[in-house]
Amino acid sequence: KGVDFSSLAWAKDNYYDRLEKMGCEIHTIVGNHTAYYKNTNDVNAVDLLLREYENVKIYSEATDIKIDNLNILLVPWINSENEKMTLDAIDKSKSRCVMGHLEFKGFRIHRGFVMDQGTDVKLFDKFDRVYSGHYHTRSDDGKVFYLGNPYEMYWNDLSDTRGFHIFDTET
């Protein structure tokens, strides 16, 4: 795994530096591409590259947070090291909403391919809404929403709807 230094410089100049100057708090979770090892989130790119920003909060373990008046369970990439802890956090959470980097079976990864393995969505039945990254294509089942990536990365991303999402904590 590697970091494109030009992209990192662009992201810092045009995203992280600007949001820091504006006083915006950023919450980010570790995903499978930012974790260096397959079985742990401990060594990860977002922690190592963004720790200089006091406004950036990085989550490598499932954590309940509160934004405005909404409790949200943040769930980073689930691996062999954090699986039991994550399941316990899901069970104990009083949040209505989950935001994570989750690999559910039965959802479109990209056009023409549906994931036939992964976590069963029933594990998240107690939550009103689940928002996730990981799959590049937007899809949902009415409760679980894969947000897709904001721009085309691969040829199979071509012509899919892209962009950013704004989350309203009040409605």
Locate the predicted segments by residue.
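Active-site-proximal beta-strand elements of phosphoester/diester hydrolases
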Residues: 69-78, 97-101, 145-148
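Core catalytic region of metal-dependent phosphoesterases/phosphodiesterases
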Residues: 1-64, 123-127
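Short, glycine/charged-enriched secondary-structure capping and boundary segments
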Residues: 5-8, 41-45, 87-89, 111-115, ...
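Active-site-proximal segments of metal-dependent phosphoesterases and phosphodiesterases across multiple
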Residues: 8, 79-88, 93-127
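Residues at the starts of beta-strands that form the adenosine-phosphate
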Residues: 25, 71, 95, 128, ...
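Conserved beta-sheet core of the metallophosphoesterase superfamily
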Residues: 110-170
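Divalent metal-coordination and catalytic microenvironments
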Residues: 11, 31, 72, 101, ...
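Active-site environment of divalent metal-dependent phosphoester hydrolases
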Residues: 2, 27-39, 65-66, 79-82, ...
